[in-house]
């Protein structure tokens, strides 16, 4: 992040706040003609022999700072916090707002307009259905660049998404499970196209029963989200129950409901839980409390 200096009326100067060890770069998708702001945080400590764990973070404009500072603080004492240092790669957009409407395009599967849930404000949904192209950007453009510039442990890759981002995480898990080893889906918008998710879940369960595949999955929601007509919590819990039966095949799944938290307020506590889930010194851990 570039530091900026501004003159003050009292003769002093004001410097823009910068998180140590971070940078922002622009990247274009070769196949989709789209441009993203990539927020990167690198640990101050040398990489372990296998390389740094990495977390690919969706909606970086809203939560990159939260996750980066949490890793910086907790990663100093892994033996106490259960969090080791990691590279954080946030995927964001050219906007000063926490969220961009482009997330609807990038995080969702193709769905007929008549099958979409009603939008809270009554308007039509923005462009949507581009999840496959977004996944190709991550796999074909972003990951190779990150692995070129940083020492990455390819056996400890996590993807984190919330809301529609959580929906995208589930799509990747159920259709491209080899892409990551740990999947964090917070308040996932399963209601966007629940039949699609359930169909893909059945297929995933069937394949996994035949081929053991160690994967770590954290599903979570805020307690207060249960009152929304989307049934966010029930849907996430139902998916967890379908996946939990695969424990003998190497699937380690957990569902967390955070007391007193809503759809947005859940983010900081979800980040903290996700870090202990994905970055424990001994590998991803369940029920970290």
UniProtKB/Swiss-Prot annotation:
Record InterPro entries: AB_hydrolase_fold, Esterase-like, Siderophore_Hydrolase_D
E.C. numbers: 3.1.-.-
Keyword Secreted set for record: no
Keywords: Cytoplasm, Hydrolase, Serine esterase
Pfam families linked: Esterase
A single Gene Ontology CC term: cytoplasm
Superkingdom as given in the UniProt entry: Bacteria
GO molecular function, one term: carboxylic ester hydrolase activity
Expression induction: Repressed by fur in the presence of iron.
Active-site feature positions: 163, 225, 263
Disruption phenotype: Impaired growth during iron limitation conditions and a strong accumulation of intracellular ferri-bacillibactin.
Localisation per UniProt entry: Cytoplasm
Top enzyme category: hydrolase
Functional summary from the UniProt entry: Catalyzes the hydrolysis of the trilactone cycle of ferri-bacillibactin (ferri-BB) complex, leading to the formation of bacillibactin monomers and to cytosolic iron release, thus making iron available for metabolic use. Can also hydrolyze bacillibactin (BB), however the catalytic efficiency for ferri-BB hydrolysis is much higher than for BB.
Family as reported in the entry's similarity comment: Belongs to the esterase D family.
Stated name of the protein: Ferri-bacillibactin esterase BesA
Designated gene of the protein: besA
